[in-house]
Swiss-Prot record:
Name recorded for this polypeptide: Type I iodothyronine deiodinase
PANTHER family named in the record: IODOTHYRONINE DEIODINASE (PTHR11781), TYPE I IODOTHYRONINE DEIODINASE (PTHR11781:SF22)
Lineage of the organism: Eukaryota, Metazoa, Chordata, Craniata, Vertebrata
GO molecular function, one term: thyroxine 5'-deiodinase activity
Catalysed reaction equations from the record: 3,3',5-triiodo-L-thyronine + iodide + A + H(+) = L-thyroxine + AH2; 3,3',5'-triiodo-L-thyronine + iodide + A + H(+) = L-thyroxine + AH2; 3,3'-diiodo-L-thyronine + iodide + A + H(+) = 3,3',5'-triiodo-L-thyronine + AH2; 3,3'-diiodo-L-thyronine + iodide + A + H(+) = 3,3',5-triiodo-L-thyronine + AH2
Extracellular topological domain residue ranges: 1-9
Amino acid sequence: LSIRVLLHKLLILLQVTLSVVVGKTMMILFPDTTKRYILKLGEKSRMNQNPKFSYENWGPTFFSFQYLLFVLKVKWRRLEDEAHEGRPAPNTPVVALNGEMQHLFSFMRDNRPLILNFGSCTUPSFMLKFDEFNKLVKDFSSIADFLIIYIEEAHAVDGWAFRNNVVIKNHRSLEDRKTAAQFLQQKNPLCPVVLDTMENLSSSKYAALPERLYILQAGNVIYKGGVGPWNYHPQEIRAVLEKLK
């Protein structure tokens, strides 16, 4: 690693640690104010509307040590981002559920847009909006192709865990990731599902953790969605595809 990257990582570590210390202190001294702040964040990801979770299932986990580790991983991973609108898309390797190694560009057909949906079953926002994504596949399959890339877990039971969530551990092997992806089959995805490599190459190059949406066309990134859960919006994909009809 270069000195510049190491310094950047150190700065991120200090920023995240400071925010966790301040957040934890606020939770102790001003619990009601902090709860309102966290609920306000939850509105952006529709977490407050998720019938599966009450605030007590997820809110108190903020500013924990596992929270710190996950946020740190996400922010460090973003330093590897190589996917930018109007620029060539990273042709990263992915693994089919039958074990075959493929690359993202192999799912492109002619000049048709390819929508990439990165996520995992322990990410409540990804699962809550999955039917909305499936509707996109149904409505636009005549003009576009779709691909789900199953990445590392957002809220693994042995990581930053939420109560009342699906119980999946962090993936130690590709077989673990494949087993986790089987849970997604219960949602009847209308497009192919592939696995990120255990080196998390797609997740890294697309800065996709914990969830993210992209549109590729002719080898370039034409739409880069915001980082989930707060800025993961399938309806933005609909707006772009409507213009391409």
